[in-house]
Amino acid sequence: MKFTATFLMMFIFVLMVEPGECGWGSIFKHGRHAAKHIGHAAVNHYLGEQQDLDKRAVDEDPNVIVFE
């Protein structure tokens, strides 16, 4: 019961604090900035793998017959 009451009080406190107080705005701004970089890194990593797979699919096409 104590844990629940403490959790609720902390939750209410966090909701009531304005973004300008205690540097919350700065923390949220840096968090958004970090999330944006992580998202871009994930997309770039996925696209790099996709290009490798596309290249491999063209190089290893089983329908192409090559006589050497």
UniProtKB/Swiss-Prot annotation:
Biological process terms in GO annotation: defense response to bacterium
Annotated organism of origin: Pseudopleuronectes americanus (Winter flounder)
Name listed for the protein in its UniProt record: Pleurocidin-like peptide WF4
Keywords: Antibiotic, Antimicrobial, Secreted, Signal
InterPro entries tied to this protein: Antimicrobial12
Signal peptide limits: 1-22
Subcellular location, record wording: Secreted
GO cellular component: extracellular region
Role summary: Antimicrobial peptide.
Pfam families: Antimicrobial12
Propeptide: 48-68
Entry similarity comment: Belongs to the pleurocidin family.
